[in-house]
């Protein structure tokens, strides 16, 4: 008996990992199945969410997972709504079954909405209905009191606003996903912490929403703790042709449609941009153009966010042909923007390529920044503690000048509009080859290639 009680705590401690399960889902499955084997898959992702436990893996079989015709389309509805949380030692993983391509088609407010913590989403394709939308009808819908999810569907949405302050979503990884053609935002995180968005392709999103969305957006980061290290990581993503074509209802004109945006981590309650129209704003600047608010909404008392002291990394991304900026921060602090390539952004709303706006402690190094014809490299509006150096841009500018900047054509191999076909690697003889700085070194480039490969580091998203 004595030996039994010695070993029982050990058995209990190991029971979590040992009992972790694989759950199987397929569009050809049945929610009455056990879900325990590939031969007995569930049909819906929501059924899997109802049984998943910390440490479990949900394996998505190939095919299309679509919203049912009678699906709930009220605010905060989603094809998959993730409320369950994993643990620090037992994350929950949602991933494509090896060799298969699961694709989500949602007509609700999001394809995936994540309210829980400790989740990994890996290798999932989310495709929206942009090809079906008529712009005039989207504009008409934006003027109605009752909002229609069809014109505002987000892709992958980490949503913390409805969680109590002590349980905001945190420790979320979105990787190897393809998010495209969403009428709303592509990958969005609001009131969350410890979020990594990496190795994704995000394109043709935010076209028809009325809330000023973008390809990849973080808004109102909510600190889980103040431990050192990066809390927000956006790396090795391709983000292109995200834009807005319907006026943002708060200002009555087009706004945002950026490739990558880190938005509002300060404590000021006024002037927040908002990809989903819930955060109230006050009169004042709401975007890089300084457009005033023309529509006010009643504001409910909300808990005050913890002061954001943590650091974010935006690195090795390619952001091109977006209607807003390639990359920018707005009312945000403590961000490292390293080894990115931006190209021909801002054609819809006129934003600059890459810039901080009303931000503090932003480090911008080793980037290649190529504005569209007539466009601008960067701007400076009420910023403090900006570090800018080792950047390459083809047209001179006087906003920020690093001693190691180079003004020259970086010589891309093939800067085609479809990034699935383009080649933004550097041609032989490029001034960006081997001339980068060594501060904040990145281990790999956009393609996963080791940095550096030679004597010096390359600038931009690719190492050669």
Model-derived regions, located:
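Predominantly extracellular beta-rich ligand-binding scaffolds that present long acidic/polar faces
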Residues: 71-79, 89, 288, 310-423
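Beta-solenoid repeat scaffold
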Residues: 52-103, 113-125, 432
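Surface beta-loop-beta hairpin patches that serve as ligand-binding interfaces in beta-rich domains
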Residues: 421-423, 430-464
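Surface-exposed loop/turn motifs in large extracellular/passenger domains
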Residues: 85-95, 113-123, 148, 153-173, ...
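Right-handed parallel beta-helix
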Residues: 66-68, 73-80, 107-231, 235-236, ...
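Acidic Gly/Asp/Thr-rich repetitive segments characteristic of extracellular carbohydrate-active
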Residues: 27-62, 66-67, 79, 109, ...
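Surface-exposed loop/turn segments connecting beta-strands in extracellular beta-rich domains
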Residues: 68, 102, 107, 124-130, ...
């Amino acid at each position: 008996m004595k030996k039994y009680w010695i070993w029982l705590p050990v058995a209990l401690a190991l029971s979590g990992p040992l009992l972790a399960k694989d759950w199987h889902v397929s569009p050809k499955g049945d929610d009455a199945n056990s879900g325990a084997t590939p031969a007995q898959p569930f049909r819906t992702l929501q059924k899997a969410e109802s049984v998943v436990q910390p440490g479990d893996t949900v394996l998505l079989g190939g095919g299309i997972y679509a919203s049912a015709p009678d699906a709930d389309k009220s605010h905060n509805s989603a094809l998959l709504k993730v409320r369950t949380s994993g643990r620090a030692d037992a994350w929950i993983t949602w991933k494509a079954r090896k060799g298969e391509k699961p694709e989500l088609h949602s007509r609700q407010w999001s394809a995936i909405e994540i309210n829980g913590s400790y989740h990994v989403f890996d290798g999932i394709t989310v495709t929206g209905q942009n090809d079906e939308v008529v712009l005039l009808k989207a504009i008409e819908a934006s003027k109605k009191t009752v909002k229609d999810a069809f014109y505002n569907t987000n892709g992958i949405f980490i949503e913390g606003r409805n969680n109590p302050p002590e349980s905001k979503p945190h420790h979320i990884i979105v990787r190897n996903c393809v998010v495209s053609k969403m009428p709303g935002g592509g990958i969005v995180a609001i009131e969350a912490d410890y979020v990594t968005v990496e190795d994704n392709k995000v394109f043709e999103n935010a076209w028809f929403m009325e809330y000023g969305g973008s390809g990849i957006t973080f808004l109102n980061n909510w600190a889980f703790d103040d431990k050192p290290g990066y809390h927000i990581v956006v790396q090795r993503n391709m983000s292109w042709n995200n834009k807005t074509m319907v006026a943002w209802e708060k200002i009555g004109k087009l706004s945002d449609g950026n490739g990558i945006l880190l938005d509002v981590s300060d404590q000021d309650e006024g002037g927040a941009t908002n990809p989903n129209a819930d955060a109230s704003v006050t009169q004042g600047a709401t975007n890089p153009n300084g457009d005033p608010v023309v529509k006010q909404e009643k504001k409910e008392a909300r808990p005050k966010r913890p002061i954001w002291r943590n650091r974010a990394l935006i690195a090795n991304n390619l952001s091109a042909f977006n209607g807003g900026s390639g990359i920018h921060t707005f009312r945000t602090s403590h961000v490292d923007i390293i080894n990115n390539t931006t190209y021909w952004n801002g054609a819809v709303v006129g934003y600059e390529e890459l810039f901080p706006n009303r931000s503090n402690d932003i480090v911008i190094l080793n980037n290649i920044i190529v504005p569209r014809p007539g466009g601008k490299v960067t701007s400076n509006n009420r910023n403090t503690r900006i570090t800018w150096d080792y950047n390459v841009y083809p047209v001179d500018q006087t906003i920020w000048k690093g001693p190691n900047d180079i003004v020259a054509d970086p010589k891309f191999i093939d800067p085609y509009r479809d990034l699935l076909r383009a080649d933004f690697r550097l041609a032989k003889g490029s001034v960006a080859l081997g001339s980068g700085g060594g501060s904040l070194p990145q281990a790999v480039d956009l393609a996963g290639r080791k940095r550096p490969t030679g004597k010096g580091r390359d600038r931009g998203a690719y190492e050669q």
